[in-house]
């Protein structure tokens, strides 16, 4: 699975395009009220990635074991310090409503999902991130 995220920003414009393999879609995140940058910061989007990953993976893993999940709520919290500091004390909570199974089965499912959630495991593994290329245009 090849995943790509692209941001295009200039005064008053903020476009976000996401793709997984050949599936391309946009999400609406307005620019900052000052006109430059995103109204959602990177920390918020990182935590959104954690919440989204876990939510989607609960449905995926439930389907694998034949559990019918009706709804999932995930909330992620943490703190960022000063400029350049990584997040700390990142934690999340989930609430799941399911049919035709026991509370114990759901709890097992949720614990298992935590071990296979790819975004969580990426952060836990400390994957390397590198700046590959920079293009610059100087005007006037």
Segments (PLM) and residue ranges:
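Extended beta-strand/beta-hairpin segments
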Residues: 1-48, 56-140
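Alpha-helical metal-binding/catalytic segments enriched in His/Glu/Asp
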Residues: 53
